[in-house]
Amino acid sequence: MFGQPYVQDCEYVCITEGPLDAMWLTQLGFPAVALLGMSMSEKQRDLVLTLPTKEVILCLDNDSAGQIGKKRAMELLGNKIKVSHINIPEEYKDVQDIKSYDILSKVIKNKRYW
């Protein structure tokens, strides 16, 4: 999982599909890791559960594959950790497309719980 060693104690961690998305979020001050694909594996779930955080925010791409990935991650994480997800506005493909800190911050703030 990309970025896992760099996550320090934090309230939440954003989970993205790709490393560029995770780097973009980290650059803007949002702790993030990347799955390196659309779907979380059981091994990745186990790694997520070792992260020093109380919540994960699923920030997967704004396409059908991202929706499938959200569902899979939720099934794997279940009630093991607090899980939420963001709704990326239609005009953006993924979090890296959101160049405004203010917009991205609002999207993350408006996360939804399952």
Residue positions per predicted region:
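Glycine-/acidic-rich phosphate or pyrophosphate-binding loops and their flanking alpha/beta elements
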Residues: 1-11
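TOPRIM fold recognition
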Residues: 10-13, 22-114
